Amino acid sequence: MKFAIVLIACFAASVLAQEHKPKKDDFRNEFDHLLIEQANHAIEKGEHQLLYLQHQLDELNENKSKELQEKIIRELDVVCAMIEGAQGALERELKRTDLNILERFNYEEAQTLSKILLKDLKETEQKVKDIQTQ
């Protein structure tokens, strides 16, 4: 259920981002627009990765393979590190004083969604580590 909510929120953010067209010579605004667009795209890819890992987790529960468990943990570590790095960039951008309300909302939304996704990935990683393998 929460995946559907997050997916709807990402879709809404992407629709809002597409409607907002920056001025032709406003490079800072264009950078903000592209950064949010990339962040939303990365969050969406992270959600798809989480769904894919859920299928791998189901397979791990059936097979109890040590190799598959290690592979899943490595993938989760990489995705979590990428999200944490993106959160740092979003935090730096939120400290800017020249953001308008829409830009601030977009940055805060991307930051909140990335925190939710990171929490879900950490929970999944703990589930994988708790599985006894052969």
UniProtKB/Swiss-Prot annotation:
Midgut and hindgut contents as well as fecal pellets (at protein level). InterPro entries: Mite_allergen_group-5/21 (IPR020306), Mite_allergen_group-5/21_sf (IPR038455). Belongs to the mite group 5 allergen family. Keywords: Allergen, Coiled coil, Signal. One of its GO terms (biological process) is protein homotrimerization. This is Mite allergen Blo t 5. The gene is BLOT5. One of its GO terms (molecular function) is protein homodimerization activity. Residues 1-17 form the signal peptide. Residues 18-113 form a coiled coil. Pfam families: Blo-t-5. May exist as homodimer and homotrimer.
